[in-house]
């Protein structure tokens, strides 16, 4: 994982290869829908993409060791991501679930975040904001910089509010954006009892500006009963609509 390894990265077409597979999956899914529901395609931030090629720690080390090399690759990934995003919108996407896995305060200094993460986030989000109507920024991890991203051109915010914080009450003090969350996510979700699942939903009921959902992903092997309980509780309480 030498910093010079980044020189091996070359530009990619955002509509070919694995991107083409995702776009075809989107096409098939949208054809299967019997009625129109808002469709958000997933995008990963360029810094997140680079971190997946090595690790967050290695990426930060390389940022500090040779920033010009890392910026060169971030620019390429940004261009590719914009190509993919525009193609997704052309196929009917209403917006994006834009995921950043390097938004934790413990990952890097604020000035580094602004130069290596925020700069490229804004380039992508600004490229699609006029062609979409609902975009969600997902900040993955603990101690996220949620107070520092309120200027991002997105309508919704998603983070591990229940599992890692900060709480929705705290963020609502300074944010007018819609919140997506309120439920535990991943393995944490699997440890819940049925009573705890119902309790999480009831706690969120009646809150303005909330789209009820997990703090991140739902495990594929989540018991169907849990999902049914969420729906049943929402309907019974006539909330979160």
Region spans (language model):
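Active-site gating loops and adjacent loop-to-helix segments of metal-dependent hydrolytic enzymes
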Residues: 1-9
